[in-house]
UniProtKB/Swiss-Prot annotation:
Role played: DNA-dependent RNA polymerase catalyzes the transcription of DNA into RNA using the four ribonucleoside triphosphates as substrates.
Name the record gives this protein: DNA-directed RNA polymerase subunit beta
Gene Ontology cellular component list: DNA-directed RNA polymerase complex
One of the Pfam families matching this protein, by short name: RNA_pol_Rpb2_2
EC code: 2.7.7.6
Reactions the enzyme catalyzes: RNA(n) + a ribonucleoside 5'-triphosphate = RNA(n+1) + diphosphate
PANTHER family registered for this protein in UniProt: DNA-DIRECTED RNA POLYMERASE I SUBUNIT 2
InterPro entries tied to this protein: DNA-dir_RNA_pol_bsu_ext_1_sf, DNA-dir_RNA_pol_bsu_external_1, DNA-dir_RNA_pol_su2, DNA-dir_RNAP_su2_dom, DNA-dir_RNAP_su2_hyb_sf, RNA_pol_bsu_bac, RNA_pol_bsu_CS, RNA_pol_bsu_protrusion
Biological processes, Gene Ontology terms: DNA-templated transcription
Family to which the UniProt record says this protein belongs: Belongs to the RNA polymerase beta chain family.
Complexes and interactors: The RNAP catalytic core consists of 2 alpha, 1 beta, 1 beta' and 1 omega subunit. When a sigma factor is associated with the core the holoenzyme is formed, which can initiate transcription.
Keywords: DNA-directed RNA polymerase, Nucleotidyltransferase, Transcription, Transferase
GO MF annotation: an example: DNA-directed RNA polymerase activity
Amino acid sequence: MAYSIANNPLLRKNFAKIHKIIDIPNLIDIQKNSYKRFLQLDTPVDARKNSGLEAVFRSVFPIRDFSDTASLEYVSYSLGAPKYDVEECHQRGMTFAAPMKVKVRLVVWDVAKDPGTRSIRDIKEQEVYFGEIPLMTDNGTFIINGTERVIVSQLHRSPGVFYDHDKGKTHSSGKVLYSARVIPYRGSWLDFEFDHKDILYVRIDRRRKMPATVLLKALGYSNDALINYFYKSEEVKLGDNGAMTKLADAELLSNQKATADIVDPATGEVILKANRKFTKAALRKMAEHGIKEIPISEEEVVAKVASHDIYDPATGEIIVECNEELTQAKLEEIIQKGITTFQVLFIDNLHVTSSFRDTILIDKIGSTDEALIEIYRRLRPGDPPTLKSALVLFENLFFNAERYDLSAVGRLKLNYKLGVDVPLDCMTLTREDILEVVRYLIELKNGKGNIDDIDHLGNRRVRAVGELLENQYRIGLVRMERAIKERMSLQEVENLMPHDLINSKPVSAVVKEFFGSSQLSQFMDQTNPLSEVTHKRRLSALGPGGLTRERAGFEVRDVHPTHYGRVCPIETPEGPNIGLIASLSTYARINEHGFVETPYRVVSEGKVTDEVRFFSALEEEGHAIAQANAEIDKDGRFAADYISARKSGEFVLVGRDELELMDVAPMQLVSVAASLIPFLENDDANRALMGSNMQRQAVPLLRADSPLVGTGMERVVARDSGVSSVARHNGVVESVDASRIVVKIDEDQYDATGTGVDIYNLIKFARSNQNTCINQRPVVKVGDHVKAGDIIADGPSTDMGELALGQNVLIAFMPWGGYNYEDSILISERLVKDDRYTSIHIEEFEAVARDTKLGKEEITSDIPNLGEETLKDLDESGIIRIGAEVRPGDILVGKITPKGETQLSPEEKLLRAIFGEKAGDVRDTSLRVPPGVEGTVIGAKIFSRKGADKDARTEIIEKAEEMRLRKDEQDEIRIIRDSAIGKLKKLLVGKAAAVKIEGSDGKVLIPKGAAITEEMLKSFSMDRWDEISIADDDTIDEKVAQTLSTLNQQIDIIKYVFDDKVQKLRRGDDLPPGVIKMVKVYIAIKRKLQVGDKMAGRHGNKGVVSRILPEEDMPYMEDGRPVEIVLNPLGVPSRMNVGQILEMHLGWGAKGLGWKIEEFLEKNAPHDEIKRFLKGAYDNPEMDRFLDTLEGEELLNLARRLKRGIPMSSPVFEGASEESIQSMLTHAGFSTTGQVTLYDGKSGDKFMHQVTVGIMYFLKLHHLVDDKIHARSIGPYSLVTQQPLGGKARFGGQRLGEMEVWAMEAYGAAYALQEFLTVKSDDVAGRTRMYEAIVKGKHTLEPGLPESFNVLIKELQSLGLDVELLEGDED
């Protein structure tokens, strides 16, 4: 069985020391899973969970009319098949979406005269079309109007309750003021805050504040209840002789001082002296001696506050009210009335302050009703309050599920923070919640509890695609709900059907707007596979409901300890968005509540297990977590007694038995892009950030070359990005060509009677969003066996199934004639000659023929006033032929537009009379090649209106596409048929026939009782094989019949699919209104590396090509090999990205081993010798076993692949050590310094010092000088100021600002300056005169008034100032 090099991960020598515990989760699952949860398509209708789209429908329906006589109820929804597949949507500029139908039930009630009784009059159920909903492609993207878009996940503040303080900044005294905020998922915000006088206030929806007790009273609590809820009370007893004692409550006494000696009544022993603290020991001693009461002085009781009303026992009148301070007079009155016990509040102003009691005192509102009306007045100032409306408003604020939604996450966080146990399906606030929020805030002020850190990932959650779309759907449905209610009330409901009520337009409009113009719906970055993957894994704090760049402070942008393993601390954009846009770490995933989780290995009793569990930031709190590289002995126990670990965001040394968790892998800390940088651990973080970002800008090159020094992540990214073609089932490759691969599926992959074949049509030279080229190339051969998940075709920037963003080049670090000053790069012409850095870019141009007021535009090759030479590449339909080489100004699509009728001169009239009407009334509006574009036409697509006649070119294109489809159909049928024949032969050959079978001519083909042979079967059509009957075995007859019927069914399906595709092909296209025909032309532009192009390594070492030197002038080594790039050594020390040097050394070793293998091949060394060398180089028992299975040609194929160098993998944070690199260099026969002697290519002299030379992976970035260089002589002008426009895209000019004017003035260049400011810029009349002067050969300048001066005058006049210009030489 042949194997494929492409799918063998062993070929990359791995330096990792830690064995893999779990595979990296699929990199784009964050998108796919979220959308799957939103749509729930695979779930049966009745088993759908109340989440996603289902939840939206259930929350808005049932919709009742105003009089409650009818209701519209939701039953279920279903999605149809999309009208166009992904490929067709790309080509036609359509949205990839499925039609949605919703089943609703209209119930009409008969309302009886008695209140509360009603009966059903009528029920109607109907499926209603509900617009289209965009579907996600297999790669986690959406196709909207023909372009691929990504919905970026949003990182926002989680709903719940948050406690904070102002750090003493609000009030001049510097006093710390605490506040609490309850944030729902949707609904009113509730804020509690203290002011500098310690009064507690509340705000609803950030309106005017009022005492918090108003809200609590509105909930139905009285002053007494509130006082006793928030304070504890002490009982005071009055003795006969006027002595006072209070009950000894251990909880309240701790931290207080004794006011008098405490004596044991039985023995007279002093247990605690006066003015000493009640310590734990003292309290225990008191309990042992049975002391229940302690003496207090009268001064202590005065100024205490009564916790209940104190009544006169004789008359029942109130002496002291609840919450009233006891004065000396009141105390005497209590004693006089003979009251023996009363209760006071415990307030010591140290651990318990009087702030809540003070709040009650300033609050003058007594009853619940008054409180409700007060709240109504605050929220609706100007409306006359009634008790009923106030109650409704208050209920709707926090307790109505339609208006207020905490969400499951909010409820979870509330329960977690406040320690309450409310069921998770209770999504509104409860009275107890509000009381507990206030209690926690008061305790916080009293010094208990902690404030929340809003940047903690336990307080921020991710809203992925599904949830963002769910919110949009809710907005749309709420708009629709209003319209339905109005319709119900306007018309007689019993005569209506559900579809008369529902208009899905508002919903479709909201969804369309979200996908088309939301800040989080972005044009996919498709430069290379890595940029696609990173874009889908991005987390943004911006967007609707998030932060704004201007408002976001430093803390939000900073790296937080909880980011570890969840959000990458390295990858974030430079510039204003730094820290606001982040990337998910490699192993991170998002749980159903939207919190980011990271995996850890479980440690039990000091032993590391292979059990892996995912933890969110909150769940991880308090656990001690060891790092992945902590040393472990062979039994899985930690080697050292004390291990460095993380605990609650701090690094601590912990005993090995205290550890509970351990990291899964060292790279779990960083994102995908950062994990592709070898020796990341030796780079400065700022440069690593640039390196991660620049890898995403690498242009796919003509010849992809996977890195010699990688990190092992290359294969993962290539597989998950979706740019490569991946085998769907196990099987054998049946046929391969450049555009398709046919795989015959293994029999064990489908059921006994099924037959199978997979056809993979490869993408050839398609255009990406960034105009780079997408092209797939097969990496398997006929006869190769592939497993499901294997890569069978490479995409852009992938090589043998691995990500390949750049090229491995031979680099020397040395100055060379000043050409690598300040990060310039000197390159060898060899790189240009070998097309190492050549890339193909594809531009799309579009011509549209419209139906104008003056007549129809026409696409044709018959264009007035153009010569044969100009039209030589157009066919008769007026479209350029494929393969034509075009330059700026060439015609791509010939088009003429009718002109308005003009007054004709006599000469023109004569010409018209002679030559007919045509020539004069049309003008040439052909599509021409814009400046700066030069290339080859590689494709043209034509879209015509349904019912319009097709031109010759369309016919040719359709025919070619039909032939391709037919070939697929025939191959599929052939392979299925061959497979079935093989199966039937196994069943039939050698068995005895039970009946004879004759041909149409009466000739016996199979005699009765004869053993069936292959020749007999070949002699008649397979369709008649079901007539064969086998003697003594009925099961065979059944199997034969079943196999044949399955075969026929499958052939029917294939034919049906083919016919459907052909039908679609022949159908006209849906074009925008007013468009008759649309032509798209694709031009491939070959971009070679040239001076001015930007290049970079993977370590943030970027530069611009300054000179391309002939190969013979480059410095060369002793064996005559010239280096390919010369970099400046001064670019390394100050930037501290030493990783590039280590990468060079390891790459040098890898290349040296490759050269050694090449020597073996050249001298036809014995196979055993090659094997021995490879085993020594890899030093890996698994690789040894693999090499032992290879013989002959297979071994030589492998050696030929490895002669470019043995690929190495140096994973992030566990890369190759210095010793490993030195041993590689020794193995390759190089000096362990990694330096060689170089000779000057021009003079042949030896350079004085040895130079560091090695292989580095270098990328060409998407900042190409061809896209930036631009020149203008005459072009468009701005409408108002008449100054030239700016920028390449608008064909603009260079701006001459005021500073440039000063410079010209300083030089005294008056006439040049006058020219700049008038005829070369915005003097309209002067521009025309200049043209005339040049045409007539006069070289005089007549400047006039610049248009900007007129603009200034008009602006002054618009201010009401009468400005006039004086003409002539008036004084």
